């Protein structure tokens, strides 16, 4: 750890995954591979022709759909209701509705239903507050619409966190509350800087939620930055693989701005977070989808979404966080202390706070874990952030840098440290 005067490093948690995060290895002989190549070569001309025809057909269909949407366009005003065009634009994937129909039937029967939300700062309510964020608005609408039912509301949004952190905290923060319906929003927190990791994390997150004991329905949400930056397309690949619903606030807002009905500042006070009117639109889009499913609920039956085959080759599943409150085999020495207060949405952390070389040389934080994949959460600081070398089984795997001088604020960062072929005991 290499900064004098006052050096700070906070280890929030160790992220471990016991299963998942390993590719499915297959083997084949050289002759089989050669045969496959030859067959592919012989049919390449026909395949190319078929693909070209299919692409042309898709393009024509897409153009016709666009014409239909434009023909039905109605101007939107912030103080009015959503237009049908906005609703249509939001339906990135209608999805399999069987589980959602089951939830709606419970609501209609006046039963108790737990509705959970997991995501980043947008879900948490930044720029709108706890009572006017899209999550609370949606839960309140459900309670008002199905007044005989009892709605339990769980908001597991934490700012500056993406799917990688999400898949490791979902069991404790959300699934432990036994949700019947879960909304997932991470499209501005997941970035292309870690595309594969984020895709595998999002895949694992959806799989973990889907396979949990209460068999919850899932509705995914796509949001956006002002310039259109979003992980929507990458998430959509996974969502469509499982045929889950995806509601795109991104598509709706950018299209409404393009038509000149609103400007970005109408729905956001910065370049990312919806403000109160923006959160209202997110919730209204979700309400519209649920209402449409309700109208047809008696006709919805059959098989649920099929999660047999993962969408990615190595989804990160069964993750958990080792924090001070739950740690059983952790040793902190020297200037590392254990603190119980909250930071960045997480309860408790290990804090290094040293001022001399002696503090540094006498300080260590050691975990013993049984895991297949290991990561770490640590705090980034706008001042006095230091560095720390991280070893796994006596091998240096990375150096963490907690310095975020000149940044927008302190936050929790994550680092994927190392993955193994199978779960086992490791020292970090």
Enumerate the language-model features and the residues they cover.
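Structural cue for short, hydrophobic secondary-structure segments
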Residues: 117-118, 185
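Short, solvent-exposed loop/turn segments at secondary-structure boundaries
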Residues: 126-131, 193-197
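Catalytic nucleophile serine of serine hydrolases
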Residues: 121-122, 157-159
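Conserved Rossmann-like nucleotide-binding pocket used by diverse enzymes
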Residues: 17, 154
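N-terminal secretory targeting modules
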Residues: 2-9, 14, 21-116, 123-129, ...
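Alpha-helical cap/lid subdomain in secreted, periplasmic
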Residues: 136-152, 161, 165-299, 358-360, ...
């Amino acid at each position: 750890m290499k900064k004098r005067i006052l050096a700070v490093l906070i280890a929030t948690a160790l992220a471990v995954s016991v299963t998942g995060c390993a590719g499915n290895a297959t083997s084949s002989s050289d002759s089989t591979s050669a045969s496959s190549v030859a067959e592919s070569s012989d049919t390449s001309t026909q395949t190319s022709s078929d693909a070209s025809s299919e692409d042309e057909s898709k393009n024509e269909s897409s153009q016709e759909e666009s014409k239909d949407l434009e023909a039905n366009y109605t101007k939107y005003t912030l103080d009015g209701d959503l237009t049908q065009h906005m609703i249509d634009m939001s339906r990135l994937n209608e999805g399999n509705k069987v589980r959602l129909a089951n939830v709606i039937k419970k609501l209609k029967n006046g039963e108790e239903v737990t509705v959970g939300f997991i995501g980043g700062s947008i879900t948490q309510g930044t720029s709108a507050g706890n009572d006017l964020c899209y999550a609370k608005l949606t839960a309140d609408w459900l309670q008002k619409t199905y007044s005989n039912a009892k709605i339990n509301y769980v908001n597991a949004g934490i700012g500056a966190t993406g799917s990688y952190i999400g898949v490791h905290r979902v069991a404790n923060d959300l699934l432990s509350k036994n949700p019947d319906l879960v909304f997932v929003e991470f499209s501005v927190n997941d970035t292309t800087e870690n595309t594969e990791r984020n895709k595998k994390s999002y895949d694992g997150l959806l799989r973990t939620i889907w396979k949990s004991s209460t068999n919850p329905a899932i509705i995914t949400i796509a949001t956006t930055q002002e310039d259109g930056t979003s992980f929507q397309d990458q998430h959509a690949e996974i969502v469509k693989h499982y045929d889950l619903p995806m509601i795109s606030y991104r598509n709706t807002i950018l299209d409404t701005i393009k038509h000149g009905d609103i400007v970005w500042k109408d729905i956001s006070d910065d370049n990312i977070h919806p403000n109160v009117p923006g959160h209202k639109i997110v919730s209204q889009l979700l309400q519209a989808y649920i209402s449409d499913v309700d109208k047809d609920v008696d006709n919805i039956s059959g098989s649920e979404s099929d999660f047999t085959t993962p969408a990615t080759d190595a989804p990160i599943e069964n993750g958990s966080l080792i924090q001070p409150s739950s740690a059983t085999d952790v040793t902190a020495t020297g200037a590392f202390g254990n603190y119980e207060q909250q930071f960045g949405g997480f309860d408790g952390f290990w804090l290094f706070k040293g001022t001399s070389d002696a503090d540094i040389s006498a300080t260590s934080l050691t975990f013993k874990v049984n895991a297949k994949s290991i990561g770490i959460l640590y705090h980034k600081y706008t001042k006095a952030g230091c560095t720390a070398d991280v070893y796994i089984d006596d091998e240096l795997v990375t150096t963490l840098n907690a310095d975020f001088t000149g940044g927008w604020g302190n936050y929790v960062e994550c680092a994927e440290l190392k993955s193994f072929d199978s779960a086992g005991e490791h020292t970090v």
